[in-house]
């Protein structure tokens, strides 16, 4: 049923429940009738360049750069603020080498070489949107993390919400099976069981990371864990040392999923309460998401390339109030793998 709406009649509910995807592969079944052929991200010849400047070279039509805050850029598009970082600094910590190449059609390739020879290769389009990301192991085996289909590879030309082409989400499961509140988790196994579930509806195609970040409608295709057990102080993105242990349950679930599929991608979302300026809250929420991702890497050895972070400020309040509210100062986690990579690439 639609969240907050009246329950449907039982026969209709059963019919829709039968259409719920039973796996990631089933969710992507309509995306393409042909097997996905993924070419190597390093096969295309590129020209070595210096590290790109922090400033974005171009901004899509309809988007306006509003401010730079703590090495983050805040844009306004369609009367909505959005924050992003020009590069994911978490990826290059302790790297043996990092280099950049210019590719045809105004694209750039970033290669991060780890001490053991593993390479993280990311291709961005002219706006900086991630359209390909692959982890290449020392034995040259490639693990696809992000893959935008060729039909859309060069068409991610503007910041248009792909969710505008979809009807409202018609949720066919109880909300408790769609959003897991960490505060009520008694058995850590619940984290794994929850994250392992497929999307709640069909995935029309694979999306770029930035399309997923910017579109609530696309993100809502997958389930969400609200980590409201991590208590952020007002105005702070720092995780108190006493709170880090609370990440253990979800970290173990992520480790288990990554052992089964090293190509998993998790989105860490940051949120704030409604106190303060909207732009400042956006930057703070992004820092909170990054703080959790960093802790998951430093303490629990979750590889940084398997996590994406995004702050949403006060856009999605858990408790509708303009007053200080600890429950709104939170992070959330989704497994977005079936949204950004073909299932066949990880099997």
Predicted feature locations:
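Conserved nucleotide-binding/hydrolysis modules and their immediate coupling elements
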Residues: 90, 94, 98-118
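Periplasmic OmpA-like peptidoglycan-binding domain that tethers envelope proteins to the cell wall
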Residues: 242-244, 264, 271-347
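Periplasmic peptidoglycan-binding/anchoring modules of Gram-negative envelope and division proteins
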Residues: 209-220, 225, 232-269, 293-298, ...
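Generic structural signal for well-ordered beta-strand positions
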Residues: 131-132, 143
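Extracytoplasmic
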Residues: 60, 68-70, 78, 105, ...
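Solvent-exposed coil/turn segments that connect beta secondary-structure elements
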Residues: 78-80, 88, 115-117, 124-128, ...
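N-proximal, low-complexity, solvent-exposed accessory regions that precede a main structured/catalytic
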Residues: 1-98, 139-200, 204-205, 209-211, ...
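Soluble periplasmic/extracytoplasmic beta-strand elements of cell-envelope proteins
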Residues: 72-76, 82-84, 109-111, 120-124, ...
């Amino acid at each position: 049923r639609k969240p907050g709406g009246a329950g449907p009649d039982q026969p209709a509910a059963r019919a829709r429940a039968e259409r719920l995807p039973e796996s990631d592969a089933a969710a992507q079944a309509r995306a393409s009738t042909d097997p996905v052929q993924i070419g190597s991200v390093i096969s295309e010849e590129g020209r070595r360049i210096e590290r790109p400047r922090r400033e974005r070279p171009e901004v899509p039509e309809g988007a306006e750069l509003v401010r730079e805050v703590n090495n983050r850029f805040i844009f306004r598009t369609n009367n909505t603020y959005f924050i992003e970082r020009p590069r994911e600094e978490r990826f290059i910590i302790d790297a043996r080498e990092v280099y950049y190449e210019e590719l045809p059609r105004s694209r750039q390739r970033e290669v991060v070489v780890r001490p053991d020879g593993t390479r993280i290769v990311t291709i961005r389009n002219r706006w900086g949107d991630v359209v390909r990301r692959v982890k290449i192991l020392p034995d040259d085996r490639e693990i696809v993390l992000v893959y935008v289909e060729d039909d859309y590879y060069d068409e991610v030309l503007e910041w248009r919400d792909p969710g505008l082409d979809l009807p409202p989400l018609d949720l066919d499961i109880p909300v408790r099976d769609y959003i897991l509140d960490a505060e009520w988790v008694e058995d850590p196994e619940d984290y794994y069981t929850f994250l392992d579930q497929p999307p709640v509806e069909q995935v029309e195609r694979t999306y770029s990371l930035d399309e997923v970040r910017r579109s609530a409608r696309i993100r809502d295709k997958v389930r969400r864990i609200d980590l409201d057990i991590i208590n952020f102080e007002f105005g702070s993105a720092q995780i108190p040392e006493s709170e880090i242990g609370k990440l253990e349950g979800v970290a173990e679930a992520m480790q288990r999923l990554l052992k089964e599929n090293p190509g998993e991608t998790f989105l860490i979302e940051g949120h704030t309460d409604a106190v303060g300026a909207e732009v400042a809250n956006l930057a703070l929420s992004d820092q909170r998401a990054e703080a959790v991702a960093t802790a998951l890497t430093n303490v629990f050895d979750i590889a940084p390339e398997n996590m994406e972070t995004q702050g949403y400020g006060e856009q999605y309040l858990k408790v509708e109030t303009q007053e200080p509210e600890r429950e709104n100062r939170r992070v959330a986690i989704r497994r977005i793998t079936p949204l950004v990579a073909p299932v066949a690439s990880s099997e």
